[in-house]
């Protein structure tokens, strides 16, 4: 789960990380009012979407008068902001962050991720923060310094100071940098985050260290114990199909292809997509119905897939272990009738009650294309999707 920058800064404040004063707003008039309340000669008008690269995309503007605040808020609010992370379709801006300006002397970068090899949280930092940090990672990786943190001790003072020194924080500002690094680590740990970034972390002209941006991703499997994080969820920023799928406990991710996939088990789902691509097809989605799929869940899965206007065929690939093939067959038949299925449907099922499931499909009267192996199923659905079946 992702959250907005201003929400990330609310979390950082709770953990003692210095951030600029700012106010989230949803209208142009509120943007001007927020700037008036903040005071000062300079404000930053920032688009709030769940994607990076906003500055390069025109979603961050520095205003030097209230008239400019109004002008920029009017430009950004409601725009379809395109960045390298949104894709060509962009993301609509529904809210802004109006923030006090800052005296930027130097832009740094700090980020935390989980390293699955060492099974530790890794703190990354660079002296080259700002809009081009991805380019720094690609072209000059030696400028990115890392520390794998022992979970028994947390980020120690000496480790924080060493990292801050390596990225150019002067000695006089080390206590501030230490507090920010340790605060970010604690925030990451205590909220069950999977990613946390401050980019840029700035040094000001008078030696202050401030988090000018904040990005958090959270482990969705841990949200049950973080209602305060769930409260930050913005459904407008999420794929509507994925939101709908989550209501029925379906693991669904939209993709760019034209072949719908309904599979039980994440591993089999990924193998199914790989096999489709092997035979020249393009999956339209990842969809894991899990081990406890009901007729209702299968029907809803079909409805969600069929909302994709690019869909030209569907492959159902089931291994009946916990999941019984006859239950899936019943769901497929009911779903096909409920949605008046008009695209080719290929079904491959193996395992518990396999023969019964196949018999039910064969006697359903529906034009279902049967397959015995995953390779055969993939070949048939690719052919069907291209009109060659």
Curated annotation (Swiss-Prot):
Q: Know the name of this protein? A: Succinate--CoA ligase [ADP-forming] subunit beta
Q: Which family does it belong to?
A: Belongs to the succinate/malate CoA ligase beta subunit family.
Q: Where does ATP bind?
A: 46, 53-55, 99, 102, 107
Q: Does the keyword Calcium apply?
A: no
The pathway noted for it is:
Carbohydrate metabolism; tricarboxylic acid cycle; succinate from succinyl-CoA (ligase route): step 1/1
The record's annotation in HAMAP family points to: Succ_CoA_beta
Pfam families found in the cross-reference section:
ATP-grasp_2, Ligase_CoA
Q: Which UniProt keywords apply?
A: ATP-binding, Ligase, Magnesium, Metal-binding, Nucleotide-binding, Tricarboxylic acid cycle
Described purpose of this protein according to its UniProt entry? Succinyl-CoA synthetase functions in the citric acid cycle (TCA), coupling the hydrolysis of succinyl-CoA to the synthesis of either ATP or GTP and thus represents the only step of substrate-level phosphorylation in the TCA. The beta subunit provides nucleotide specificity of the enzyme and binds the substrate succinate, while the binding sites for coenzyme A and phosphate are found in the alpha subunit.
Highest rank taxon of the organism: Bacteria
**Quaternary structure (record):** Heterotetramer of two alpha and two beta subunits.
EC number(s) given by UniProt? 6.2.1.5
Q: Which reaction does it catalyse?
A: succinate + ATP + CoA = succinyl-CoA + ADP + phosphate; GTP + succinate + CoA = succinyl-CoA + GDP + phosphate
In what residue span(s) does the ATP-grasp domain sit? 9-244
One Gene Ontology biological process: succinyl-CoA metabolic process
- Organism placement in taxonomy: Bacteria, Pseudomonadati, Pseudomonadota, Betaproteobacteria, Burkholderiales
PROSITE patterns in the cross-refs: ATP_GRASP, SUCCINYL_COA_LIG_3
């Amino acid at each position: 789960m992702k959250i907005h920058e201003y929400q990330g800064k609310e979390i950082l404040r709770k953990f003692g990380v210095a951030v600029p004063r700012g106010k989230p707003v949803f209208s142009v008039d509120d943007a001007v009012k927020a700037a008036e309340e903040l005071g000062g000669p300079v404000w930053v008008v920032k688009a709030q979407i769940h994607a990076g690269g906003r500055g390069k995309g025109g979603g961050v503007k520095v205003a030097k008068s209230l008239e400019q605040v109004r002008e920029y808020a009017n430009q950004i609010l409601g725009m379809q902001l395109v960045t390298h992370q949104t894709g060509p379709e962009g993301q609509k801006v529904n809210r802004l962050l109006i923030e006090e300006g800052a005296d930027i002397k130097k832009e740094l970068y700090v980020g935390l991720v989980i390293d699955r090899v060492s099974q530790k949280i890794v703190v990354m930092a660079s002296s080259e923060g700002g809009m081009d940090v991805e380019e720094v990672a690609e072209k000059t990786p030696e400028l990115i310094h890392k520390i794998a943190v022992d979970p028994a001790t947390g980020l120690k003072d000496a480790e924080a100071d060493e990292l801050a020194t390596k990225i150019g924080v002067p000695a006089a500002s080390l206590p501030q940098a230490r507090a920010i690094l340790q605060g970010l680590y604690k925030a990451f740990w205590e909220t069950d985050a999977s990613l946390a970034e401050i980019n840029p972390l700035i040094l000001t002209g008078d030696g202050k260290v401030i988090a000018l941006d904040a990005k958090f991703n959270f482990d969705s499997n841990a949200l049950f114990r973080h209602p305060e994080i769930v409260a930050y969820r913005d459904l407008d920023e999420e794929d509507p199909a994925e939101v709908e799928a989550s209501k029925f406990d379906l693991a669904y991710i939209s993709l760019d292809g034209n072949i719908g996939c309904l599979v039980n088990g994440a591993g089999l789902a990924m193998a199914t997509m790989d096999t489709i691509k092997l035979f020249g097809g393009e999956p339209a989605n990842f969809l894991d119905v899990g081990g406890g799929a009901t007729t209702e869940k299968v029907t809803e899965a079909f409805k969600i897939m069929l909302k994709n206007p690019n869909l030209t065929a569907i492959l159902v690939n089931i291994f009946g272990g916990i999941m019984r093939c006859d239950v899936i067959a019943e769901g497929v038949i009911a779903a096909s009738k409920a949605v008046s299925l008009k695209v080719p449907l290929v079904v491959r099922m193996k395992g518990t009650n396999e023969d019964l499931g196949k018999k039910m499909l064969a006697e359903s009267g529906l034009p279902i294309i049967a397959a015995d192996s995953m390779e055969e199923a993939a070949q048939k659905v690719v052919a069907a999707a291209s009109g060659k079946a």
